[in-house]
Design a protein with these regions (language model features):
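Cell-wall polysaccharide-cleaving catalytic domain and substrate-binding groove, primarily
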Residues: 2-199
Length: 199
């Protein structure tokens, strides 16, 4: 499938999430404390190279960044299915994935779901494997049925934010160079999906 057609198949909610990520990520950066190295529109040089881009990252096109976000951070981890169930939870997962890798928010979602099923009374535990597949989506749909769409969304966003904050605190505690990024992560990544979006 050609890349333009693939992106054209993105839902309006997915495109809005990508636009929000661009707003947070900004343009070109090359912070010596960032192990990701040269980054443009939130895409690291290594990821750009995986997608066939060989030019200077200062010239990395926004259109290719959109495609990278859609393929690597929405389609591959299965977050397109999550966006269909709850755009706000989908945004939380995709945004977190861009910053921490897509497996990490998948695990946070799975841990949150397992903690909310009342010891399996509402739905079975899911395997915490970092792959948000059909069992994870079924568990989230069950949580929606039990708690209502808005409340399920608020509960998951809160628990994913809490885990993300803990992740950043561990990174900064283990490696003081990451402290450079803590203010930005705290301002732009924790609580950046307003609970009002769950309504």
């Amino acid at each position: 499938m050609n890349k333009v057609k693939l992106l054209a198949g993105a839902s309006a909610a997915a495109l809005a999430i990508i636009a929000a990520i661009f707003h947070v990520e900004g343009g070109y950066v090359n912070n010596p404390n960032d192990p990701g190295g040269p980054t443009h529109h939130g895409v690291t040089q290594a990821v750009a190279r995986e997608h066939g881009y060989q030019g200077d990252m200062r010239d990395f096109p926004k259109e290719l960044a959109q495609q990278v976000f859609f393929e690597d951070y929405i389609l591959k981890p299965g977050f397109d299915q999550l966006i269909a169930l709850s755009p706000a939870v989908g945004e939380e997962a995709v945004d977190s994935g861009v910053n921490a890798g897509p497996a990490q928010p998948s695990k946070w979602l799975q841990i949150a779901l397992n903690s909310l099923n009342r010891r399996g009374r509402d739905y079975p535990d899911v395997t915490v494997d970092g792959r948000a597949g059909p069992a994870t989506m079924a568990a989230y749909a069950s949580l929606q049925r039990v708690r209502g769409r808005a409340e399920a969304c608020r509960m998951i966003v809160k628990l994913m934010d809490a885990q993300q904050a803990g992740h950043y605190l561990r990174l900064a505690g283990d490696n003081s160079t990451y402290e450079t990024f803590m203010p930005g992560w705290t301002i732009n990544r924790i609580g950046n999906v307003p609970l009002e979006k769950c309504a």
